[in-house]
Amino acid sequence: INKAKQLAQGVVANTLELELMENIGYRNTPIQITDNQILENLKRVQFANDIPESTQLERPKGLNLGYNLTIEMETGTGKTYTYIRSMFELNKEFGWSKFIIIVPSIAIREGVYKSFEVTQDHFQEIYQHKITPFIYNSSRPQDIENFASDSRISVMIINTQAFNATGKDARRIKMELD
């Protein structure tokens, strides 16, 4: 866990990333296509949908693992459905099973969780399995352990305020636990 903290803070060299990720639980399989191919695919989709083309791929700050994929759509146009379906497709195509959704408010967090509940049967018919979503709660560290160790498609839904919370049970996401 300390290595994970140091890596997140940029203290440890990025060469430890893969080794570290394999030692702390399930992780998504690296994509077997190049960054240039991913960027070209992204540009093709953006062009087809009259969206300004990206000039580069975005990654989490300080890491060379994964991509920051942002879905920006007007309210009520199917954003949540789109990213839930994208999770199933990423699982089908690449075996990805870990996703984190960060939302700006508690109300949106609850709405996203509800969307997983109400679309569960629909996606079960299409993909023959379900996603296991949970809402991050600092007083329930076992949920994070389950998320990391479960081989099924798992989604952690967290609101940005959880990163700034204070108190005895707050910020457990950054703490070393038993």
List each language-model region with its residue ranges.
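RecA-like P-loop NTPase motor core of helicase/translocase proteins
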Residues: 1-178
